[in-house]
C-alpha cells in the first residue's frame, strides 16, 4: 500500500482542552473514538485513534466530545462504539446530533431519545462545525476489539486531511470542567 500525503493542521498545544475520561494518541490521526458505556482503556488509541474514551451522558458529555473534536481540525471521523448507555442512550443521541442538529429555540437534540438530550453550553456554530467536520461511524453495541481496530484502520486509510478551517476553541463553562471532570469524554 502506498502512503498518501494529506494536509494536516497544527493542533493547539493544550488539546484536548476540555477535561474528561479519555486517552490521547497521535493528534494528527483523523479518528476520534467514543466507547459509550464500555471502557476499552487505550485499545482504540493503540489502533491509531487520536483520542478515545467513554461517553455516559447525552448532554454535558456530548458537549465535551464536540468541544474537543472541533478544536482539532485533523479529526474527520467519529467512531461511536461500545455498549449503549441505558436511560441516557448516548450512542443514539450522538447519531441524532450528527444527523439532525439541535433545535435552535430549546437546545434539544432533534430526534434524540435519551433522558436529557439538550445542548446548553455551545453556540450553534460549534454544532454545525462538528457536523461538517466529522463523518460518524456507527458501531453502537460493538465491543469486539478486532472489529474496532479494523474500522479505525479503514478510517485512517480514507483520511481526506484536515478540514479547511482553523481549530475552533471553546472555553468550557464551569459546568463542563467542574461537574465530574473525569467523566464523559
UniProtKB/Swiss-Prot annotation:
Pathway in which the depicted protein is active: One-carbon metabolism; methanogenesis from CO(2); methyl-coenzyme M from 5,10-methylene-5,6,7,8-tetrahydromethanopterin: step 2/2
Binding site for 5-hydroxybenzimidazolylcob(I)amide: 88
Record's keyword annotation contains Ligase: no
Membrane protein topology class: Single-pass membrane protein
Enzyme Commission numbers on file: 7.2.1.4
Reactions that this protein is recorded to catalyse: 5-methyl-5,6,7,8-tetrahydromethanopterin + coenzyme M + 2 Na(+)(in) = 5,6,7,8-tetrahydromethanopterin + methyl-coenzyme M + 2 Na(+)(out)
Cellular compartment(s): Cell membrane
Catalytic EC class: translocase
Disulphide bonds in the chain: none
The entry's keywords: Cell membrane, Cobalt, Membrane, Methanogenesis, Methyltransferase, One-carbon metabolism, Transferase, Translocase, Transmembrane, Transmembrane helix
Gene Ontology biological process terms in this record: methanogenesis, from carbon dioxide; methylation; one-carbon metabolic process
GO cellular component labels: plasma membrane
Cofactor dependence: 5-hydroxybenzimidazolylcob(I)amide
GO molecular function, a single term: tetrahydromethanopterin S-methyltransferase activity
Cofactor info, note text: Binds 1 5-hydroxybenzimidazolylcobamide group.
Cytoplasmic side: 1-21
Extracellular topological segments: 39-185
Record-linked InterPro entries: MeTrfase_MtrA/MtxA, MtrA
Main function: Part of a complex that catalyzes the formation of methyl-coenzyme M and tetrahydromethanopterin from coenzyme M and methyl-tetrahydromethanopterin. This is an energy-conserving, sodium-ion translocating step.
Subunit-structure text: The complex is composed of 8 subunits; MtrA, MtrB, MtrC, MtrD, MtrE, MtrF, MtrG and MtrH.
HAMAP family xref list: MtrA
Family: Belongs to the MtrA family.
Protein name: Tetrahydromethanopterin S-methyltransferase subunit A 2
Amino acid at each position: 500500500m502506498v502512503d498518501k500525503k494529506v494536509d494536516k493542521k497544527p493542533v493547539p498545544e493544550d488539546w484536548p482542552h476540555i477535561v474528561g475520561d479519555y486517552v490521547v494518541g497521535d493528534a494528527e490521526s483523523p479518528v476520534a473514538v467514543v466507547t459509550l458505556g464500555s471502557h476499552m482503556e487505550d485499545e482504540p488509541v493503540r489502533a491509531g485513534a487520536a483520542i478515545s474514551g467513554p461517553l455516559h451522558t447525552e448532554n454535558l458529555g456530548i458537549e465535551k466530545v464536540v468541544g474537543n473534536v472541533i478544536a482539532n481540525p485533523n479529526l474527520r471521523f467519529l467512531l461511536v462504539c461500545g455498549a449503549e448507555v441505558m436511560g441516557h442512550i448516548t450512542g443514539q443521541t450522538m447519531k441524532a446530533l450528527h444527523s439532525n442538529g439541535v433545535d435552535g429555540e430549546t437546545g434539544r437534540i432533534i430526534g434524540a431519545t435519551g433522558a436529557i438530550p439538550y445542548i446548553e453550553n455551545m453556540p450553534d456554530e460549534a454544532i454545525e462545525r462538528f457536523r461538517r467536520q466529522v463523518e460518524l461511524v456507527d458501531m453502537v453495541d460493538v465491543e469486539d476489539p478486532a472489529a474496532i481496530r479494523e474500522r479505525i484502520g479503514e478510517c485512517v486509510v480514507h483520511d481526506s486531511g484536515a478540514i479547511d478551517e482553523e481549530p475552533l476553541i471553546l472555553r468550557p463553562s464551569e459546568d463542563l470542567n467542574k461537574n465530574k471532570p473525569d467523566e464523559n469524554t
